[in-house]
């Protein structure tokens, strides 16, 4: 099985890059993992609703171009379903058993995900109502994926 993480925007801060690299190294023993960083559109401070929509649509098309036809897609969105770590682990496990060769996670840019991306997603997931920088979200997601594999293995990592 392969895991794919698609993000809008590139990691800039050294501490985030190091954290992501550490979890990518840990995850490699369980699954092939591919991370794709897409260019983000510049969003003016006082952008109109139509300008924000245009930006979402452009970023959404970039995201959709990287999703395989048979991928199981989990979009991260504030309105998505919140899961405890054990249920998240079970979700990944079920998709592996169901025969999906790739589980793709999608993290949008500062404006979130376009409606087309949300529609393409098989599952919308939320990490809570807090607003987090999308770059930090990549690190949080990778830690939770690693935790899911540790739960599956029955290791004491998840207490």
UniProtKB/Swiss-Prot annotation:
Residues the entry annotates as binding S-adenosyl-L-methionine: 76, 108, 127-132
Task performed by this protein: Specifically methylates the pseudouridine at position 1915 (m3Psi1915) in 23S rRNA.
Subcellular location field: Cytoplasm
Gene Ontology annotations for the cellular component aspect, listed alphabetically: cytoplasm
InterPro entries assigned: Alpha/beta_knot_MTases, RlmH-like, tRNA_m1G_MTases_N
Entry EC no(s): 2.1.1.177
Coiled-coil segments: none
Record-linked HAMAP family: 23SrRNA_methyltr_H
Record-given protein name: Ribosomal RNA large subunit methyltransferase H
Pfam annotation, one family: SPOUT_MTase
Gene coding for it: rlmH
